[in-house]
Amino acid sequence: MTDTYNSISNFIENELTALLSSDDYLMDDLAGELPNEVCRLLKAQVIEKRKDAMSRGKQDLLSKEIYDNESELRASQSQQIMELVGDIPKYSLGSELRNRVEGEPQSTSIERLIEDVLKLPQMEVADEEEVEVENDLKVLSEYSNLRKDLILKCQALQIGESKLSDILSQTNSINSLTTSIKEASEDDDISEYFATYNGKLVVALEEMKLLLEEAVKTFGNSPEKREKIKKILSELKK
């Protein structure tokens, strides 16, 4: 931060030099009312007093006070960023989010995280003529890119979360079907069931068709029942 302090000190010194070199306004109100020699002596004393009030030591104190205030402001802004982001270490953020998906206790809210990221302050370089402006612009660029990247990733997590309930529902249906098949076949290996499923289904439908054809002959005296059975048969043949 030496460059920042030197910039402040040089600015104060230049401003004071310009002020002291422009003394035309001194004693203007008394011009013509006092002898010229008296005005000259008074002007010299005023300049001397002003120089003493703005001595190098006092300039240094003023520069240090301004520098400390700026450092305090930067520290305050950094603290604000830390408070808004939260106290989650960056290396554990992924674990926190995974725990939430897996149903474990979690302390991270995606919505809260996005809200905090959006609250990160917009920061700008106060004086583009400072010596450190190039480095400051680089830091601000990295900060802005990080903020944008965080927002995009959080939004991607939101989209994924919205699809999670559908995926879990489908998974539960598959698990329920698998359990039912295992109970019916009394075999933990269900690959055989799926391999022979189509063949067994065709056989079952053929048997049903034969039974229905027999039923048509049985209900010969009931045109209404016979028509219903024929309709079922026509559907099976499609």
Swiss-Prot record:
Signal peptide: none annotated. It comes from Saccharomyces cerevisiae (strain ATCC 204508 / S288c) (Baker's yeast). It is found in: Nucleus; Chromosome, Centromere, Kinetochore. This is Inner kinetochore subunit NKP1. The modification Phosphoserine is found at S222. Component of the inner kinetochore constitutive centromere-associated network (CCAN) (also known as central kinetochore CTF19 complex in yeast), which is composed of at least AME1, CHL4, CNN1, CTF3, CTF19, IML3, MCM16, MCM21, MCM22, MHF1, MHF2, MIF2, NKP1, NKP2, OKP1 and WIP1. NKP1 interacts directly with OKP1 and AME1. Keywords: Cell cycle, Cell division, Centromere, Chromosome, Kinetochore, Meiosis, Mitosis, Nucleus, Phosphoprotein. The keyword Nucleus applies. GO terms for biological process: attachment of spindle microtubules to kinetochore; cell division; meiotic cell cycle. The keyword Membrane does not apply. GO terms for cellular component: kinetochore; nucleus. Belongs to the NKP1 family. Component of the kinetochore, a multiprotein complex that assembles on centromeric DNA and attaches chromosomes to spindle microtubules, mediating chromosome segregation and sister chromatid segregation during meiosis and mitosis. Component of the inner kinetochore constitutive centromere-associated network (CCAN), which serves as a structural platform for outer kinetochore assembly.
